[in-house]
Amino acid sequence: MAVPKSKQPRKQRRWLYKTAKLHERHKLLHATLSKDLRKKYGKRAIRVRKGDKVRIMRGQFAGHEGRVLEVDMKRCRITVDGVTVTKADGTEVAVPIHPSNVMITDFGEVDEVRKKILER
């Protein structure tokens, strides 16, 4: 990857999000852990997965809790159960949320790969 020419951190950050390859986007999909999970596992943040229970901390839906329905790697967004808006024609559409605006309160499935990540 070529380095951006700008010296401004905000432009460098935008460039990173726009040009990151799919296998590099895992780092951009981390969310903070709740105090209980942080104390239990000794980690501050971990990658969000489908099935995790999260609490939205910022934005229009702050305070809402629900399960992660989908993780969109291409757009670096997640969709949460119950976080929808109504379109003009009456259909419900899920609102994509950036993972940095949520807190993981409970893990969905803890398989072997995630166990290794938590035990590191």
Swiss-Prot record:
HAMAP family: Ribosomal_uL24_A (MF_01326_A)
Family in the record: Belongs to the universal ribosomal protein uL24 family.
Gene Ontology MF annotations: rRNA binding; structural constituent of ribosome
UniProt-listed GO biological process terms: translation
Complex formation: Part of the 50S ribosomal subunit.
Organism: Archaeoglobus fulgidus (strain ATCC 49558 / DSM 4304 / JCM 9628 / NBRC 100126 / VC-16)
Protein function: One of two assembly initiator proteins, it binds directly to the 5'-end of the 23S rRNA, where it nucleates assembly of the 50S subunit.
Keywords in alphabetical order: Ribonucleoprotein, Ribosomal protein, RNA-binding, rRNA-binding
Taxonomy, superkingdom: Archaea
Protein name per its UniProtKB record: Large ribosomal subunit protein uL24
GO CC term (a single one): large ribosomal subunit
Gene3D superfamilies listed in its UniProt record: 2.30.30.30
A Pfam family assignment: Ribosomal_L26
InterPro entries to which the protein is assigned, alphabetical: KOW, Rib_uL2_dom2, Ribosomal_uL24_CS, Ribosomal_uL24_euk/arc, Ribosomal_uL24_KOW, Translation_prot_SH3-like_sf
